[in-house]
Amino acid sequence: MPLLGNSVKLRNVLSLVVACAAASALAEPAVIYDMGGKFDKSFNEAAFAGAERWKKESGKPYLDFEISNAAQREQAQRRMAERGADPIIGVGFAQGSSLEKVAKEFPKANFAIIDSVIKLPNVESIVFKEHEGSFLVGMMAALASKTGKVGFVGGMDIPLIRRFQCGYEQGAKYANPKVEVSANMTGTSPAAWNDPAKGSELAKSQFAKGVDVVFAAAGGTGVGVYQAAKDAGKLAIGVDSNQNHLHPGTMLTSMVKRVDIAVYNAFKGTKGGNVNVLGLKEGGVDYAIDQYNEKLVNAEMKKKVDAAKADIIAGKIKVADYMADNACKL
C-alpha cells in the first residue's frame, strides 16, 4: 500500500508538472501600446509590426491594448497578468513605474519594458542608443541643407527626446561645423505625442527662419511636421519606423529604431533581470535608405555617413549621451 500511495502521488506530481508546462506553452504574449496607439506611424506602430511578425511566423495569437489615458497603463498590465499572458511587453518609458509595481505583484509572470530600466528578476529592460542613430541623420540633414540651417521638433520634453536632439545636433555639426540648429519641443504632457497640428505649426515657424531640413522625434505629432515639409518644399526626417514612404521626395531619411525587433524577440522569450542595450553595433538604430528616398541621398552623402557609422561602431567617434548627465556636450 505505501508503494501504491507513492505511485499515486508521483502521478499527481507529474500531472501537475505537465499541466504547468502546457499552460506556459499556451500562454499568449501581450503588448501594451502607449499614447498614440499602434497606428501612430512611428514608435507604437514599430512595436505592432514586431508583434505581427511574431504572429505570422509562429501562427499563434497575442493580446494587445491601446491606452488612451495614464490610468489605463497599470490597469491593462494587471489585467494581462491576471489573464495569464506571458510575456507582457510595456511599450514606452511612461509604462515603467506601473509595470514595476505589477511585476512585483506577479513574480511568476515575465515582463519586458521598452525605453526604461526596471531592476527586477522577472523583467527584461530594452533600451536604445538613440543618440547614435540621431547623429547619422543629423549628418544627413547638414549635408542636404542648402541654407546651412536645420531643425528639430521633439514630442514631450523629456530626457529621452533630448537625447535624440543632442545626437542630431552633434551629427549636424560634425558634417558642417557652421550649421545652425533650431529646436522646439511640442509640449510637456503625453498629449505632445499626438498633436499633428502643433507639429505643423512648429515646423512652419522653423521654415520661416530659413530651416530647410527638419527632424521630428515626436510620435504621431511628426505626421504634421512631414506634411508641412512637403507643402513647403522642404525636407523632413522620420523616426522610429521607416517613414520614408509617407511623402516620397521630401522625406530625406528616417532614424530607424528597431522597436519591432525588440518586441519580436521579447515575444520569443524574455531574459528576466537583463538590460538589453541596442545601438548601431547591435543593429538597434540606423538610418533608412530605400526606393522612396534614394534620389535624395547622393553617393558622397552616403559615403560620409557610412564612414561615421563605422567609426562610431569602432569607438573612434564618441557620441555624447544627453541622459548620462542631462546635458548636451557638443
Where are these regions (language model features)?
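Short, Lys/Arg-enriched N-terminal segments with co-localized hydrophobic residues
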Residues: 1-7
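Gram-negative bacterial Sec-dependent N-terminal signal peptides
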Residues: 7-26
